[in-house]
Amino acid sequence: MNKLDYPRRNGTHKVRITILCARNLARKDLFRLPDPFAKVQVDGTGQVYSTEISKSSLDPKWNAHYDLFLGIGDAITITVWNQRKIHKGSGFLGCVRIPAFNIQSLKGAGFQRLDLGKLSPDDDELVRGQIIISLLSKDGPSSGNPLAIVGPSGDVRGPSEDDSSEDSLPEGWEERRTDNGRVYYVNHATKSTQWDRPRQPGVVGSSHATSPQQRHNTHNGNSGDRQAPAGPTRSTTCTNLMNNGHRSRDLSVTASDERRHSTEILSSVGKENTSPTTPVSATTTPGKKTSSSNSSSAGGRTLEQRPTNEPATPTSSTTSASVRLHSNDNHVKTPKHQTNGHAPPESTPTSPTGQQNYVNGNAQNGSTSGNGSGQAAQPQSASNGWTQEDAATTTSPSTTTSPPRHSQSPPTPNISPPASVTPSANGNVHSPNANSTPAGSGGGSRSYTAATPGQRSQRRSSRQQGEESSTRRRSSRGTRNGGTSGGGGGGGSGQRYASAAIAAANQAARPFLDLPPGYEMRTTQQGQVYFYHIPTGVSTWHDPRIPRDFDTQHLTLDAIGPLPSGWEQRKTASGRVYFVDHNNRTTQFTDPRLSGSILQMIRRGTVPPTSAANAGTPAPPSATPATPSAAAAVPPQATPASNATPTTLTTTTNPPHRIVPDLPQGLLEGADLLPKYRRDLVGKLRALRTELQTMQPQSGHCRLEVSRNEIFEESYRLIMKMRAKDMRKRLMVKFKGEEGLDYGGVAREWLHLLSREMLNPQYGLFQYSRDDHYTLQINPDSGVNPDHLSYFHFVGRTLGIAVFHGHCLDGGFTTPFYKQLLNKPITLGDIEGVDPDLHRSLTWMLESNISGIIESTFSVENNSFGALVVHELKPGGASIPVTEENKREYVKLYVNYRFMRGIEQQFLALQKGFCELIPSHLLRPFDERELELVIGGISSIDVNDWRNNTRLKHCTNETTQVLWFWQVVESYSSEMRARLLQFVTGSSRVPLQGFRALQGSTGAVGPRLFTIHLTADVPTQNLPKAHTCFNRIDLPPYETYQLLCDKLTQAVEETCGFAVE
């Protein structure tokens, strides 16, 4: 996995993409398999990641994730390459392009299997196979992607508890595969085919022994031969990315996107919490969706209809809800079966207009799924668990009580719920009485619920939990039905989702990863994370997944582990704990370590069924009244995990909230206000030091012995021989011929002397940014030294050693250099401090009309060792004139050229050495000016701060020698003060916290202040003595001010070395 990190642009959201694996890649060599790797790119932003190389495989597995920063119009392109042939230009294996308008639909939907396509329609490369990915929003706390297992045919599932369900087939059945590898089953007794694996007779609740009546349903009178399903439709796990058949494939999200079985990723579930279930499938017409959301009282289900302006899919998409069955007198009445059964792949005739007509065998009427109108009133089939007679008395599919009976007729597309639910104008959802709206009533249109993002994510979470008994074969996914299923792949999809609705009610299922239905996580402009309830418009600091009476501080460190990288724990003025995310510069009350499993544990152990947190909004009454028989049918453990979270709401009038300029409504009502994210540089540095300390080995030393005369070359040879982990060990430096023992002071002096040599422009590695400004930039002509890239690698390692061990370098770079080190783009404003004249010229060009004034082209002349070299800013730029239309492009290219002119290789070598010690993600909280202070410290010296943070030993503030000492310091120039500070501490730079944070001996707890020690027993002819490891200067008791001034100046300017008298 790449270690690259890219800066976050304004207005972007963070999305984590997981590249799980690829399937059935094209084999282009006869004797060897490819070495595939995948490349992820955000178009137009420069964000590029590459997976590791999978050796010799047509089904590579990477399981790598990357965090992308996506804007509103950003698209994602994923390409697969063969590393063996990429250098020959023939390693392309396929690509997938996910446009911006589909990214939102795929976020949180689990793993998706996408077909690979060509880069352009003119490509002759053979492309085949699929890639399996997932997208997950990372702007809020999440538990990450669940585990996944890819079957031999490319289907994705969670780790099943066992493979006991794959028993031998019943007598008369045979397993076959289609040309594309999909498994289907042939019943030789009835001469029929089906996708779902049949069960042995006698299995409770899921028996698939077909009765004669059922066999009549599944038998096609025209299929006398035993062939594979003719022209099987593509599985709904595959998303068609073809655009006009050839172009780079854009993802086309259909109504079945949220019902694909590839999203059924789950953790293994204990067997003791499972029980037989029977599917109650509900089928929708193309272009419409059905949703299964939990009611707060009896788990009522609402139906969602996609707006008619969304594209309709050419294949049927089916959903289903699972019902936990119990013995009861209320049985679901099964309508008469159809007499014209269909084979699974072909069940939907097509109208001349290109729309698919779905035939209901009960009413013998066809309905066209074009615009949602003209739907005939039809009784419900038993596969939906509803009939026209009992629709008014049964509450919801999740509370239906009936014996395990199945109707083998193809699913009918039209569903009439017992209670129509419609959204009100203000966003709240209201529902009429179930009895007042009989199922299947005429009218031609159906009302629908406006599903919020939180509801969609909850439904996706429910589907992930529900597949407890999934196995490796696609046909055996979910609770199986022995009959045929209509709608091609859609019919199989409906039965695969047979246990989706019970997932949220199963306490043993994997805990949900997203927020409860109706909730959304948002961030204020000041970086404060809060939760917004969409139906009521109420905002709160409190995470709705955590009970209000639960204190997360009760959890031990062993249970939740340490804070993630870049996070810090603080407390408000009232003592409430909150957390600071330095990576994204946000604050929140929710502990980022609370994963889904911990949240599930909290809810199970401490939350009564009626007291789940809902962010201060009372749970509304259920939209569907529950009958006593329906309520009794719900077992105690079937209480939804988020039962107090509103999912369907009655029509209410929201009370007016006071409008706060900088905070949403409702956030000031609580007792504690979440602090804003502050640009606390000291706090960031403290967090960085904590992270670096965890990376430092507990034993061993990084030993360097160099001479003062050859400090540059000897340091270069020693450091370039070391490994990165050796440089992270405790640094110990010794100068040859000196007796100084390094407790930090010798290392500071070594870095001070080395940085002055290393950054000296006379060596040709760096140059001053301009004549009157002594900031440094990389010299584009450093190539005169054939080993210059190795030296830049050494410079990067030296910068990393200084930062890792808490030291400062004596030298400063330009602001664009630090921005490049942070992987931030360079803008026109960055050039002002480096070249003011050029900045004024380019700014005037942007603000003025240059037509007929400037005759420049997209090329620049550069003087390299006396020779004029023309550099084209873009291909063919010498012949492209700069006009009013393209001047902004010219300025952008020119600014990039000004700072990257001939230094790309040098900077990459330097950055490589730096990142070997300091991972780039640790520097994300810092900007370029803060990084400058981290590397170089503060060059200006504040005498008052120095005096106020000085410790006195064997003297007081009123001692004569101490008063004289400060008089001498005040009389010194800035350069002499820096040399005095370097003489005493080993470094001429002040830490960014000031003199109160001067670092003392290595391993000391806390800082060590500057110390003046008056040595009374030392002759006054001696010079002052410095102890750099302890930041201490020993002053003899000089008799006069002038003597003290002369001796101190002589010691600063002329002494050199340790233990030298």
Curated annotation (Swiss-Prot):
Annotated Polar residues bias: 207-225, 233-255, 264-273, 348-359, 379-392, 417-439
Modified residues (Phosphoserine): 262, 416
Family annotation (Gene3D superfamilies): 2.20.70.10, C2 domain (2.60.40.150), Hect, E3 ligase catalytic domain (3.30.2410.10), Hect, E3 ligase catalytic domains (3.90.1750.10)
Disruption phenotype: Flies exhibit lethal defects in hindgut morphogenesis.
Domain HECT positions: 723-1061
Molecular function GO terms recorded: ubiquitin protein ligase activity; ubiquitin-protein transferase activity
Protein EC: 2.3.2.26
Active-site residue list: 1029
GO CC terms of this entry: cytoplasm; cytosol; ubiquitin ligase complex
SUPFAM superfamilies assigned to the protein according to its UniProt record, in alphabetical order: C2 domain (Calcium/lipid-binding domain, CaLB) (SSF49562), Hect, E3 ligase catalytic domain (SSF56204), WW domain (SSF51045)
Pathway the protein contributes to: Protein modification; protein ubiquitination
Ranges for domain WW: 167-200, 513-546, 561-594
Domain C2: 1-116
UniProt entry keywords in alphabetical sequence: Developmental protein, Phosphoprotein, Repeat, Transferase, Ubl conjugation pathway
Ranges of biased composition (kind: Gly residues): 480-494
GO BP annotation list: embryonic development via the syncytial blastoderm; embryonic hindgut morphogenesis; germarium-derived egg chamber formation; male gamete generation; negative regulation of BMP signaling pathway; negative regulation of hippo signaling; negative regulation of smoothened signaling pathway; positive regulation of receptor-mediated endocytosis
Subunit structure: Interacts with phosphorylated MAD.
Function in brief: E3 ubiquitin-protein ligase which accepts ubiquitin from an E2 ubiquitin-conjugating enzyme in the form of a thioester and then directly transfers the ubiquitin to targeted substrates. Down-regulates Dpp signaling after gastrulation by promoting MAD ubiquitination and subsequent degradation.
UniProt protein name: E3 ubiquitin-protein ligase Smurf1
